[in-house]
Amino acid sequence: MVDVKFEERRFESPGQLQLLDRQEAEEEEEDCFESIDKLISQGINAGDVKKLQDAGIYTCNGLMMHTKKNLTGIKGLSEAKVDKICEAAEKLVNVGYITGSDVLLKRKSVIRITTGSQALDELLGGGIETLQITEAFGEFRSGKTQIAHTLCVSTQLPVSMHGGNGKVAYIDTEGTFRPDRIVPIAERFGMDASAVLDNIIYARAYTYEHQYNLLLALAAKMSEEPFRLLIVDSVIALFRVDFSGRGELAERQQKLAQMLSRLTKIAEEFNVAVYMTNQVIADPGGGMFISDPKKPAGGHVLAHAATVRLMLRKGKGEQRVCKIFDAPNLPESEAVFQITPGGVADAKD
């Protein structure tokens, strides 16, 4: 086990760090959701459960996140069957009112994953949180993808070392993922680079439809193995390519909203952190007193979907500045971090 002093965030590597016991991680996952197979104990036919799984629904929690209209669209499921399935799922999952104390108790399952920079972690209240979407937007070379690469490694640290003790799913829409970049970051954290790469599942998306289908396929993997992070880099790129002009803007925003809804459901269903990067566009209404005004792409649809929004900009040399743009529980503030060969780290004076 690696001796990591998180008070000073200095990562020493006298040994090799591996994921914690697989059985322990799987037991933690079982506490997060109820498997769709448990519907059989409530009198639901095994064949109907298989149809739900074929449609990408693997947990009772995920089932309750679908409308009955969507469920009746699954081949072989009538309205009567859907009603019976939903009634059975409600016996296994509480989807009604709970007290504020219960919400507070549920929040204790939130895991905060270190970014590699103590200053950035403090800005975020401890790190990137599970059960929510964190969006980072900024110009090119502002550090968005570098944070993503560092999180690919830090997520695999034990929870006691400010990690997530889980695997990572990476959906790449711009071709910016570099496995060779992971190697020095893993070495910095004292981890076996080969094992770290094996715990990252990667997919290159080429259209917005492909991107959405990749999200649907994730449910099967996340129901079987302990995942703690989903990265989408970048969330908006393919939508800006596949939809052009004002005539297709309404359809684009509708499809974008559906995909963001899916991301939200994944975060809450499997207790994973969703980190997505976003591009910026020129802001004609930015005002004459702001030099080169820019705003995040995606409009209000994307703004409402992200729980925490981070604005990144270039600093001096390899330094970058992160500002809390929007968050329900964090004050508007800034932190300076640095991009190093070992990933994101605290800035050096």
From Swiss-Prot:
SUPFAM superfamilies: P-loop containing nucleoside triphosphate hydrolases, Rad51 N-terminal domain-like. CDD domains: DMC1. Keywords: ATP-binding, Cell cycle, DNA-binding, Meiosis, Nucleotide-binding, Nucleus. Double stacked ring-shaped homooctamer. ATP binds at G138, E139, F140, R141, S142, G143, K144, T145. One of its GO terms (cellular component) is condensed nuclear chromosome. Belongs to the RecA family. DMC1 subfamily. SsDNA binds at R240, F243, R246, R252, R320. One of its GO terms (molecular function) is ATP hydrolysis activity. This is Meiotic recombination protein DMC1 homolog. May participate in meiotic recombination. The gene is LIM15. It holds the Pfam family Rad51. It comes from the Eukaryota. One of its GO terms (biological process) is DNA recombinase assembly. The keyword Nucleus applies. Its main location: nucleus. InterPro entries: AAA+_ATPase (IPR003593), Dmc1 (IPR011940), DNA_recomb/repair_Rad51_C (IPR013632), DNA_recomb/repair_RecA-like (IPR016467), DNA_repair_Rad51/TF_NusA_a-hlx (IPR010995), P-loop_NTPase (IPR027417), RecA_ATP-bd (IPR020588), RecA_monomer-monomer_interface (IPR020587). The keyword Ion transport does not apply. DsDNA binds at R240, R246, R252. It is found in: Nucleus.
